[in-house]
């Protein structure tokens, strides 16, 4: 559970870093011409890598590692870091209260914890979209990054990812 929370903090920190890049000494290009030049450079590097790793053949067509996740970006409602954190905290709180209820010795305490857990569940219902995003993040996090076939698929899908992330 704490790993999920750490991942949210990391994602939020990365988003903050990227948002600050535009203020001083940005690494990302500022004009359309700069963007086109950077995309051209990246495309040339990717094509060179695709040749090196032999991923230009038709057998690699449609073998993108992240394509299912990329296509879902447009269908997702926008989630904020705050709402992801709140959902995660509510989830952990629910787990804590379940454990406390299991250890409770008297019925009054068990009933109170059950009632509070009902409130937590009602609050979590507000964050159903965030829960879907969490599942997506877990799926992405579980990708076997050391698998050669997956690495080649990631190479082939990078330009799409680059364009969407830009």
From Swiss-Prot:
Cytokine which binds to interferon gamma receptor 1 (ifngr1). Has activating effects on primary macrophages. Induces nitric oxide production and phagocytic responses in macrophages. Primes monocytes for production of reactive oxygen intermediates (ROI), although the effect is short-lived. Also has inhibitory effects on monocyte priming by ifng1 (interferon gamma 1) and tnfb (TNF-alpha 2). Stimulates phosphorylation of the JAK/STAT signal transducer stat1, but fails to induce stat1 nuclear localization. Its main location: secreted. Belongs to the type II (or gamma) interferon family. Keywords: Cytokine, Glycoprotein, Secreted, Signal. Glycans are attached at residue 91. Strongly expressed in spleen. Also detected at lower levels in gill, kidney, heart, brain and intestine. In immune cell populations, expressed at highest levels in peripheral blood leukocytes and at lower levels in splenocytes, granulocytes, monocytes and macrophages. GO terms for molecular function: cytokine activity; type II interferon receptor binding. This is Interferon gamma-related. Homodimer. The keyword Glycosyltransferase does not apply. It is found in: Secreted. One of its GO terms (cellular component) is extracellular space. The gene is ifng1r. GO terms for biological process: immune response. It comes from the Eukaryota. Residues 1-26 form the signal peptide.
């Amino acid at each position: 559970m704490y790993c999920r929370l750490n991942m949210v903090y990391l994602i939020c920190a990365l988003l903050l870093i990227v948002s600050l890049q535009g203020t001083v000494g940005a690494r990302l290009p500022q004009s359309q011409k700069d963007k086109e030049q950077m995309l051209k450079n990246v495309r040339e590097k990717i094509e060179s890598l695709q040749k090196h790793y032999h991923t230009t053949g038709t057998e690699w067509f449609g073998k993108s590692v992240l394509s299912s996740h990329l296509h879902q970006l447009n269908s997702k409602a926008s989630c904020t870091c705050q709402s992801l954190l709140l959902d995660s905290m509510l989830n952990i709180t629910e787990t804590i209260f379940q454990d406390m209820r299991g250890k409770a010795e008297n019925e009054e305490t068990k009933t109170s914890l059950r009632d509070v857990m009902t409130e937590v569940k009602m609050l979590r219902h507000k964050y159903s979209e965030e829960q879907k995003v969490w599942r997506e993040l877990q799926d992405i996090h579980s990708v076997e990054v050391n698998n050669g076939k997956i690495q080649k698929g990631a190479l082939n899908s990078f330009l799409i990812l680059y364009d969407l992330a830009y």
